Swiss-Prot record:
This is Expansin-B3. It comes from Arabidopsis thaliana. Disulfide bonds join 57-86, 89-157, 94-100. GO terms for cellular component: extracellular region; membrane; plasmodesma. It is a peripheral membrane protein. The gene is EXPB3.
Length: 264
């Protein structure tokens, strides 16, 4: 199937040509309210399943294995933010004391819920995560309720033993490079992404294509590549030097040696 990489490349070309507000802008950036806020929650998939099968963020099979396994969720556009909310982490807790646990569950945003509420914050959780909102023995009855009121707040992402990694998307070439960001501690979201080629001093802005995917068109692009990330919420910056090697390959993942601090 070559349609997906072709679509990514087309989107990247269109975005390169657009002139408008840059994703670099850091004014008015702030981490989402750390206080508990009201929302609603539903669940999807099998009762004890992982939920998403990849999702609109583009994480693919990562959602099926630890550390994302059974911790993923979809959100409505309020928190999805056209894909820039991908990777953010939230604590979610339900409210009915007769059936709900006092403990909150941690949810990693990996998908968008197009059928969810457009006006109020809505989490669509995996069956496994939704069940963990209940006290012991009440997971089934809680799932039977379908839609429940919850409270949520932003929390720091923590991928123990993991550093930020960059997955080279299928179809990438020396003239079109698309990267997916994985395992970002702290805020978890990306506001802008820049790339620096071998022997260069200039950082080139990458374009946000969709989900957690970013791209650049130019050519020929020469590795190794250094990558600079700026978080969406607070504008924190991190640079991974020569993280993508000279002989990089499509569908390969390259881990850095660093990560953001696992705090907000």
């Amino acid at each position: 199937m070559q349609l997906f990489p072709v679509m990514l490349a087309t989107l990247c070309i269109v975005l390169q040509l657009l002139i408008g507000s840059s994703a670099l802008a850091t004014t008015n950036r702030h981490v989402s309210n750390s206080h508990w806020l009201p929302a609603v929650a539903t669940w999807y998939g099998s009762p004890n399943g992982d939920g998403s099968d990849g999702g609109a963020c583009g994480y693919g099979t990562l959602v099926d294995v630890k550390p994302l396994h059974a911790r993923v969720g979809a959100v409505n556009p309020i928190l999805f933010k056209n894909g820039e909310g991908c990777g953010a982490c939230y604590k979610v807790r339900c409210l009915d004391k007769s059936i709900c646990s006092r403990r909150a569950v941690t949810v990693i945003i990996t998908d968008e819920c197009p059928g969810c509420s457009k006006t109020s914050t809505h989490f669509d959780l995996s069956g496994a995560v939704f069940g963990r909102l209940a006290i012991a023995g009440e997971s089934g009855p809680l799932r039977n309720r379908g839609l429940i009121p919850v409270i949520y707040r932003r929390t720091a992402c923590k991928y123990r033993g993991k550093n930020i990694a960059f997955h080279v998307n299928e179809g990438s070439t020396d003239f079109w490079l698309s990267l997916l960001v994985e395992f970002e501690d702290g805020e978890g979201d990306i506001g802008s992404m820049h790339i620096r080629q071998a022997g260069a001093r200039e950082w080139l802005e990458m374009k946000h294509v969709w989900g957690a995917n970013w791209c650049i068109i130019g050519g020929p692009l020469k590795g190794p590549f250094s990558i600079k990330l700026t978080t969406l919420s607070a504008g924190k910056t991190l640079s991974a030097t020569d993280v993508v090697p000279r002989n990089w390959a499509p569908k390969a993942t390259y881990s850095s040696r660093l990560n953001f601090s696992p705090v907000l």
